[in-house]
Amino acid sequence: MAGPRVEVDGGIMEGGGQILRVSTALSCLLGLPLRVQKIRAGRSTPGLRPQHLSGLEMIRDLCDGQLEGAEIGSTEITFTPEKIKGGVHTADTKTAGSVCLLMQVSMPCVLFAACPSELRLKGGTNAEMAPQIDYTAMVFKPIVEKFGFTFNCDIKMRGYYPKGGGEVIVRMSPVKQLSPINLTDRGCVTKIYGRAFVAGVLPFKVAKDMAAAAVRCIRKEIRDLYVNIQPVQEPKDQAFGNGNGIIIIAETSTGCLFAGSSLGKRGVNADKVGIEAAEMLLANLRHGGAVDEYLQDQLIIFMALASGISRIKTGPVTLHTQTAIHFAEQLAKAKFTVKKSEDEEDASKDTYIIECQGIGMTNPNL
């Protein structure tokens, strides 16, 4: 699919791996040859890390593309995509690099393949600086499926920092087109639930303490709902290494989902981990939006590809979201507007409507 190479500046805005994920996925979908320069220029260790490299190699394999300059530490790559193919694709970060970020880059592409796909993704399932796999399965999945597709996410093995070792298998069938979404009516919170986990050598008491601290924190602000956070000991044969963490989800009467999550670190007590997740959830409920701060940017590429006008109501628009919009406009020529919400109940809140006229991408194989 030769044509003029599109130049992408990897150092602007968010300046990290997300620019690489959005731009290479759109390149693959639209058949745009790409040069990305200044990769992760804004980070303490610039250039490609193992998880970015495995994501790039996966995209290359998804479409039999050509990839040059892709090695650890590289700050410039060129990518020339060909036709997207379904079937079985494997990516292994060989570290605790996030399998959820591998999903972010590959899922939009295989939706437009000729046949069903199976993505075998290896790395960290519950890793810092990335969505936890529980977030992907419990929040991202039900919301993104509103675009008119479904996928199956099978967690074979959980993996934690620093070794990774997790494995997730994602199965999905292609679609002809994506439908637009409208997520602007938040409704009221009807349920709060979650899981607090320990894996490996960590004692079960840590899970119970995280859950109890989170419940106490939420109760201060939301008194009329039962908060059901289950402490879980991950089975030995389903978790590699040691880890602990928590995810708490609030569900509303209109089917909106919000989350707060946190991972344990050496020397941080369990209560603090639980409270951090609870406070993140409460912050996401205060802004009046219909999606939380971590879902915003993950929906942008789907809004850009969909046929018709999508609208989502958000809290403050994150830098990740602004970055995703910038590249969706530059590469896919989708049209986005971001406006302060004019609803009376949002007047005192930092609430926005992100609207997109999608490009109506059509699967040429179906």
Curated annotation (Swiss-Prot):
Pfam families with a match to the protein in the record: RTC (PF01137), RTC_insert (PF05189)
Binding site for ATP: Q104, P131, Y294, D297, Q298, H320
GO BP: RNA processing
Catalytic residues (positions): H320
Compartments in which it is found: Nucleus, Nucleoplasm
UniProt-listed PROSITE patterns: RTC
MF annotations from Gene Ontology: ATP binding; RNA-3'-phosphate cyclase activity
Family under the similarity heading: Belongs to the RNA 3'-terminal cyclase family. Type 1 subfamily.
Name of the protein: RNA 3'-terminal phosphate cyclase
Organism: Bos taurus
Gene name linked to the record: RTCA
